Amino acid sequence: MLFRSEALEFFSIKVQDGPLTSRLQKIREGDIILVGRKATGTLITGNLIPGKRLLLLSTGTGLAPFASLIKDPDVYENYETIVLAHGCRQVSELAYGEHLVDGLRNHEFFGPLIRDKLVYYPTVTREPFRNRGRITDLIASNQMFDDIGQPGLDIETDRIMLCGSPAMLEELPAIFTARGFVEGNHSQPGHFVIEKAFVER
């Protein structure tokens, strides 16, 4: 791997008595953490059919799985453009995403390779900001694509990963399906994939 870090980053909200976060928030220096070698779950690029533009659509802490994807050189080899959209209520909630993307773009070795391929699109719903609105609405209206100066959704070239609020994970797949996009999984790759952990209630 071209970009490798010895550090693990966790971006999460604290869930009272949550099975994972109640333990994560108590981790201290020197604690042992076991990490598997193989990625699991539904947000795996192998669950997508080949394409040219990868849309990573997130709200809130749904940005977390994309933090590792945008550091993966294979993603940049397989896609011409990677669009990372991050929607939050307030501007202050965008801080981690901005820090993450700025760090990658300014990385001594990785930055020059990804600078022209990675498009970051932050948006908020409750405060004045250069991009305003819910990701769902910005996709449906084509506003996000207009804002970044790129063509709208194209089933031939676009592949999509979703992670975030239950509302987004319910609404966007309906929009994509209505346009002919097919959800992918381990046995049958498709045009888009959803982080199921957020969907199941």
Language-model-derived ranges and their functions:
Residues P65-E77:
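Histidine-anchored nucleotide/phosphate-binding helix
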Residues A85, S92-R201:
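Reductase modules of NAD(P)H-dependent flavoproteins
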Residues L54-L57, M161:
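Conserved beta-strand elements of the Class I
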Residues T40-I49:
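Short, Lys/Arg- and Gly-enriched loop/turn segments at beta-strand edges
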Residues L2, T59-A64:
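Ser/Thr-glycine-rich phosphate-binding loops at phosphate-binding pockets of nucleotides
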Residues M1-E29:
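Ferredoxin-reductase
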